[in-house]
Amino acid sequence: MRLTSILVLVIAATFHTTGTALTLTKDSKAGIANGDSPASGDFIDANSARLLRRVEKDKVDYEQDEQRSFGALKDAVKKLNPVTAVKKFFKQRARRKKVIQTARNADDNLAWAMRKVYNEAN
């Protein structure tokens, strides 16, 4: 809350000082006269044309945008499909069971190997 108040105060003070920097009377000569900038010669080329950046306007392909939007909608609907979610759940469950069975087999193999070593030692 304090930060907001401080920012509002700083902005208000800035506007207040910039608003009173120049007098607004008609007699005052403090205003800036209209004229060319001293460095305006830098922006003119040999053909007396101004050197401005040119920005190419993008050609909008509405069909492509439409296809993209329908593709996003299609992906969202696929994610919400309960049948797909159930299939995914059972696939993940089968993978987990396979990993657990592999770990149990490895544990059994380790126990078998340890028993064999123990029996040979005795």
From Swiss-Prot:
What is its induction behaviour? Expression is strongly up-regulated during the early stages of infection.
User: Where is the region TAP1-binding?
Assistant: 69-86
Coiled-coil stretches are none
According to the record, the segments passing through the membrane are none
Mention any one GO cellular component term assigned to this protein in its UniProt record. host cell nucleus
Q: What happens when the gene is disrupted?
A: Leads to smaller lesions on soybean seedlings.
User: Which stretches of sequence are listed as region Nuclear localization signal (NLS)?
Assistant: 87-98
Q: Does the keyword GTP-binding apply?
A: no
Chain span(s) of sequence motif RxLR-dEER: 50-68
**Signal peptide location in the record?**
1-21
Q: Partners and quaternary state?
A: Interacts with host acetyl transferase TAP1.
Query: What does the record's free text say on domains?
Result: The RxLR-dEER motif acts to carry the protein into the host cell cytoplasm through binding to cell surface phosphatidylinositol-3-phosphate. Residues 69 to 86 are required for the interaction with host TAP1 and its re-localization into nuclear speckles.
Q: What does this protein do?
A: Effector that suppresses plant defense responses during the early stages of pathogen infection. Suppresses cell death induced by effectors and PAMPs in plant hosts. Interacts with host acetyltransferase TAP1 and causes TAP1 relocation into the nucleus where it acetylates histones H2A and H3 during early infection, thereby promoting susceptibility of host plant to P.sojae.
Q: What is this protein called?
A: RxLR effector protein Avh52
Query: What organism is listed for this UniProt entry?
Result: Phytophthora sojae (Soybean stem and root rot agent)
Print the organism lineage.
Eukaryota, Sar, Stramenopiles, Oomycota, Peronosporales
